[in-house]
UniProtKB/Swiss-Prot annotation:
Organism (species): Onion yellows phytoplasma (strain OY-M)
Subcellular location: Cytoplasm
UniProt function note: Catalyzes the reduction of the glycolytic intermediate dihydroxyacetone phosphate (DHAP) to sn-glycerol 3-phosphate (G3P), the key precursor for phospholipid synthesis.
HAMAP family membership: NAD_Glyc3P_dehydrog
Domain of life assignment: Bacteria
Phylogenetic classification of the source organism: Bacteria, Bacillati, Mycoplasmatota, Mollicutes, Acholeplasmatales
Binding site for sn-glycerol 3-phosphate: 101, 132, 134, 188, 241, 251-253
Protein's name according to its UniProt entry: Glycerol-3-phosphate dehydrogenase [NAD(P)+]
Amino acid sequence: MKITIIGSGAWGSTLAQVLTDNNNQVLLYDINLSYVEKINQGKHPIFNAPLVNVKAVSCLKQALDYSDLIVLSVPMKFMRHLLKQIALMLTTPKSFVNVSKGIEPLTFLRVSEIVKQVIPAPLLANFASLMGPSHAEEVILRKLTLLTAASSNPAFALEIQKLFSCPNYLKVYTSSDLVGNEICSAFKNVLAFINGILVAKNFGINSQAALMSRGILEMSVLVTFYQGNPQTVLGLPGLGDLIVTAFSKYSRNFNAGAKIAAGITYQQIIDSSLQTIEGFQTLNAFYQLQLKHNLDLPIIQASYQLIFESKPFETVFATLMQRPFKSEF
């Protein structure tokens, strides 16, 4: 099967390997000419690893015309602009699979909602998300990984499950809760920030366990608000992705939290990072959402104060500890 991947960063290029391992034909698109050149030379553009039987182009129209299945692997801040470009170029219906994590600031929309808003209905065949605990650094080495394909169309979820599952190292489950999967995958980045701060400040495992437990509760509040299934919080895109993002040395968001603890501002982190750190934009979006709808999300509030307002950790921590006594649930 022919498949187009939009965005040849760490994850997009790694998924190209997954698909070619399953004997599919993959064409990557990127505006980064250096990435395109490396891929066409048989090299992964980010990691020191081969990437064979994959081609790349810098022409979006050529990439879109290549296949009827489009994988979206671009940072959230570029998603709407990219989709507007795609909408202008489509002449036949396409199916989309999103692998980017986050929600859009100001609108609070998920990727599936942006796609439906921008791509004309006659040209949108199907949509699914592919999420879960999946550091590209491990998948490129073909280490065991589990993901979830979520779609409101069960048949399409099954199609994506079969397409991306590799018997030796990658297994995909299906879900009908597209909403929950998208929200969980976005929210876990916020908890990774805070865990990075806790570790950098030598807090113990007790505090990290407390953060994860109360954080999962806030995750379920958001999933319920968006009318998703709270059970999804316990799945791969929820608890699974949270563990990977909040505790791994590969996690950009965890490492960003450690830098925040060292006194580096979020803008300095963004300016010095070679790869996108989605959590900053996601945190801002969730903070504005909870203000607008009066949601009780104390970890979101504390995270925003630490990262965007540069409040002292001791002050923010004291505020959290002084919240009124209450039942756990």
